[in-house]
Design a protein with these regions (language model features):
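Helicase C-terminal subdomain and adjacent C-terminal extension
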Residues: 1, 121, 156-256
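Conserved coupling/interface region of RecA-like P-loop/ASCE motor cores
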Residues: 1-40, 103-105, 184
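Hydrophobic/aromatic beta-strand patches that form the interior of the parallel beta-sheet core
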Residues: 4-6, 55-57, 132, 145-146, ...
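Helical mechanochemical/support elements of P-loop NTPase systems and associated helical scaffolds
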Residues: 12-15, 74-80, 107, 163-166, ...
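Short, conserved catalytic or adaptor-binding loops enriched in Gly and charged residues
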Residues: 22, 44-49, 119-125
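Conserved helicase/translocase motor-coupling segment
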Residues: 31-114
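Conserved helicase C-terminal RecA-like lobe
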Residues: 87-101, 105-172, 184-188, 204-210
């Protein structure tokens, strides 16, 4: 079946659809919802830019091999995830409205354990927060999505994250707010991630710091973005196919 090209999205706050539209749809993806329809209370989360419910929180912790020997985890990113989740819960967000997305089973298992054992709130509350793989979240949505990228190493390798379809899915699951945590120095080696990080920076949403209420703009150097490289173009095409195929499988409902 030939996928229908997505033209209108009804899920995301308009600022969250901007990068997917530019990266995968040549800027043609239209918004079927307004900012007012996707606005949350200003008290819910200390967004770096109050009018844009998104952020990339730079974490420089080193990745580790998981106990299985076949996956990866990142303790520093798990710490950041807990801080974000706790802040949302403490400000009235229901745990079933929060999703934590990661490309690695090792990180998924570690985050689940970290939240219940180390979190500042009662373990039973964290147990209601869904922590799952990128693939498990395809075709689904949450009010708030937290993405932990995991990879952080001297070799500058990002493994599964090289698949643009996974990035595409991760970026398009949130309705009201998107938080990402990762190592921008490592991720920026991949052209599509580099463009995404530059997008966060252009919107003053690429931040760093230890206190979630006092994050500062991250000044890490990023390679110059090259939107029209062959690699980036191919990545955008493949990632767009993921949304188109998902759209076709959902009875042609244009809901990214």
């Amino acid at each position: 079946v030939q996928p229908i090209r997505l033209q209108v999205q009804y899920r995301m706050h308009p600022c969250l659809s901007e990068f997917p539209s530019n990266a995968f749809y040549e800027g043609t993806l239209q918004n079927g919802v307004t900012e007012a329809e996707r606005a949350d209370s200003e008290e819910v989360f200390p967004w770096p830019c109050p009018s844009k419910p998104m952020m990339f929180w730079a974490q420089m912790g080193v990745e580790e091999m998981s106990a299985s020997g076949y996956s990866y985890l990142n303790r520093g990113e798990a710490y950041a995830v807990e801080k974000i989740v706790a802040h949302l819960l403490q400000n009235g967000i229901s745990p079933d409205e929060i999703g934590v997305v990661t490309p690695y089973e090792g990180q998924r298992a570690y985050v689940v354990n970290y939240l219940t054992r180390t979190g500042v709130l009662h373990p039973s509350i964290y147990q209601e927060v869904e922590v799952a793989s990128v693939d498990a979240f395809q075709g689904r949505e949450k009010q708030y999505i937290i993405v932990t990228c995991v990879r952080s190493n001297d070799r500058q390798g990002i493994g599964f994250l090289n698949d643009p379809r996974r990035l595409n899915v991760a970026l398009t699951r949130a309705k009201l707010g998107l938080m990402m945590v990762g190592n921008p120095k490592v991720l920026a080696k991949q052209p599509l991630f580099r463009d995404m990080l530059q997008h966060f920076r252009d919107n003053k949403c690429l931040v760093e710091g230890n206190n979630i209420n006092q994050l500062n703009e991250c000044m890490v150097a990023l390679p110059q973005a090259r939107w029209k490289t062959r690699a980036a173009g191919l990545a955008r095409f493949r990632a767009k196919q993921t949304i188109d195929e998902e759209n076709a499988s959902e009875n042609y409902n244009v809901n990214v």
